[in-house]
């Protein structure tokens, strides 16, 4: 079975389990990136009942937001239900710019509260499909599987690392409430994704055509320093919004009597972009202790 057929089989299995367990169609997550574009195409080819959902992060590039709207319009014309979920935190509307002052620290590679709030809340108590791939990072290779049962209690989590995993029966019969995930293209390489995109003539986010390697949140700490610098040169308004949010974060820290060695939002931004300590200022360990 080739990778396309295997991915389709995974989607068909997930759709069956979704209807059986949740009495709802499979929820396909869509970010406007190349992986989720392939994911939707595979779901269509699989002939399953599914809907498409985008989590509006508030920090995506404008071009990506417009592309998502265009694609959703085209999908809906083909009878696919699409929806955009706006983020909420503590039962209130949220954004990257409100979240930073509330969390009292910048989002970092070690503390990615932004992902948890702005992206990963979508699909609670549903079966979702994502475009996660092992080739994207060593961490994903270690911690992500073909299918997953997510639970706050790590002891109750189930991750199937292969299609014939010995935990498969446990996964299918699990009665605990929670989110289930299928990652149909988890074993695809970058070349696999692009080859499929070109062979099937799939729409492509225009930012890739500009040479962008990724189309996620602008300024994401998981991106390299050079990529982040280029992003802020390309979209300077986002740099201003981060600096403003960091300034409000400092005000919130002072109001709570927390250490506040930074003087301005620009100081925080410089520290954040360097991903290192500016002399005399809070370390990452200090911030993580506060978060805990």
Region locations from a protein language model:
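Nucleotide-activated chemistry modules centered on ATP-dependent adenylation/adenylyltransferase
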Residues: 1-292
């Amino acid at each position: 079975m080739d990778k396309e057929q295997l991915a389709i089989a995974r989607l068909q299995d997930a759709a069956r389990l979704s209807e059986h367990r949740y009495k709802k169609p499979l929820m396909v997550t869509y970010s406007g990136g190349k992986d989720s574009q392939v994911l939707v195409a595979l779901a269509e080819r699989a002939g399953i009942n599914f809907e498409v959902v985008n989590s509006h992060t508030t920090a995506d590039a404008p071009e990506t937001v417009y592309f998502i709207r265009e694609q959703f319009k085209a999908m809906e014309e083909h009878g696919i239900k699409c929806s955009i979920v706006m983020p909420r935190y503590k039962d209130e509307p949220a954004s990257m710019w409100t979240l930073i002052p509330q969390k009292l620290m910048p989002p970092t590679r070690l503390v990615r509260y932004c992902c948890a709030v702005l992206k990963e809340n979508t699909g609670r108590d549903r079966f979702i499909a994502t475009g996660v791939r092992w080739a994207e990072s060593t961490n994903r290779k270690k911690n992500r599987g073909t299918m997953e049962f997510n639970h706050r209690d790590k002891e109750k989590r189930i991750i199937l690392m292969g299609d014939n995993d010995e935990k498969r029966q446990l996964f299918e019969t699990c009665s605990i409430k929670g989110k289930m995930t299928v990652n149909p293209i988890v074993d695809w390489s970058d070349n696999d994704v692009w080859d499929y995109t070109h062979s099937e003539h799939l729409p492509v986010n225009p930012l890739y055509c500009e040479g962008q390697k990724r189309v996620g949140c602008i300024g994401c700490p998981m991106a390299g320093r050079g990529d982040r610098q280029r992003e802020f040169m390309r979209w300077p308004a986002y740099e201003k919004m981060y600096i403003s949010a960091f300034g409000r974060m400092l005000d919130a820290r002072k109001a709570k009597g927390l250490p506040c060695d930074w003087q301005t939002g620009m100081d925080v931004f410089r520290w954040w972009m360097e991903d290192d300590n500016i002399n005399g200022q809070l370390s990452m360990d200090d911030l993580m202790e506060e978060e805990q």
